[in-house]
Amino acid sequence: MADKTVVLGYGVTGRAVVSALVSRQEKVRIVDENPTQNLEEVAQESGIEVVDVTKGFSWGEVLKDCSQIVLSPGIRDDHPIFASARDASIPILDEFDLASRWDKRPCSAITGTNGKTTVVTLVVEILNQSGIRAEAAGNTDIPLVQAIDDSDVEHFVLESSSFRLAHSLNFLASPATWLNFAPDHLDIHRNLDSYEQAKSKIWDGISRNEDAIANLSDPVVARHAPNGCTSFGTTSSTCRVQNGFLLFREEKVIALDDVLRKFPHDLENAQAAVATAIRSGATQEACAEVLANFSGLPHRMEDLGFVKGVRFINDSKATTPHATISSMRAISEVTLILGGQNKGLNFGDLGVLKPNGVVAIGEAADHINEVFQNICPVQIAKNMQEAVEKSVAMTRSGGTVLLSPGCSSFDWYNSYKERGDEFRSLVMEHGRKVKDE
């Protein structure tokens, strides 16, 4: 009898999926292509079947007695499990599908190449301010299958990556918001079209067209937006910036002078958050309260202050050229620390930038040097300390040192957070040294 669920990948999401299935008396088989001792210990203690990929196996054998497959985020589009599942007519699911099957509480969903975490955070805060108990889940530290264990939550706000959307079958979220689109994750998706199609699935589960919240200033998003959607990003959108105010429909939500963060991308995020929150049941008063006090998240245009007249900004979360371009548009007189591990993206787009200087880091340093060598001075740094030292030497008083790498962090670090933390620490150390001089 085919009654087992194969869980591919045993990271944060995989562990949560296995735990949720086991707690519901489901039979589970774990496949992890980078097994750890911890996984072996879990298998021994719980009696869960684990496939040891180091000892030789076939996907046909792995899928024997299997009724469904749940993928962890980040499985490549060309992974052999897809062909094997198709041949055996076994459905492939995402954790969102399981959670939607088990729990019917309302969900909002946010996707986009950039800005997801910020908008999710804003929507959660606005809903809570409105008296609706909300929690973030999904592409966060808490997968949805884990979040639904909290019976006090009234509304889930889901950070929805392309990895999750690509393999969801029956995921229901309404409203659902698409922030923007730019090349990303081409080391995972077959091509740019595959990435776009994954993102567009955000609207598959909406209840009505008004619950599709779309950035109409982005041509890719606009192309997929249904008629009657709730829009933002243009001067004629449902939610827009006009005459010094942020409006929803024709009502003033908040004066721009009262919004704490006013970079162009901040105002776009604010529009998305207001539209999503109001469609989720929030009040305009709550929107205004949150936007007036929201100072941003770490590693996202995080202002570290000034040292001898030079401003330092930590934008380590910028892991694509698109994100770096967006950040650079917000400031001038910039020395840019750029680089890391490329995700199969085209750095040529960065050529539109006009920084005062570039410090190139990581695996992509040589490629970045090629892009900017005829635009501005470029130096290559072997580590972050050297990058900070060289950027300081290149920057005059009144200028800004911006860490906005445009790449993932996995050449030097375990995460963009670790990269940003080191940059922040080095800037603080630089400030102390200058003060002691």
Please tell me what each predicted stretch does.
Residues 3, 57-64, 73-216, 220-229, ...:
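Phosphate-binding loop of NTP-binding sites
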Residues 4, 16-20, 24, 256-355, ...:
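Nucleotide phosphate-binding/pyrophosphate-handling subdomain across enzymes
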Residues 12, 76, 114-118, 267, ...:
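Residue-level detector of alpha-helix initiation sites
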Residues 21, 69, 110, 139, ...:
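Residue-level signal for inorganic ion chemistry
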Residues 29-33, 212-216, 337-339, 354-364:
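Short internal beta-strands
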Residues 39-47, 345-399, 435-437:
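C-terminal helical cap/extension that packs against the catalytic core
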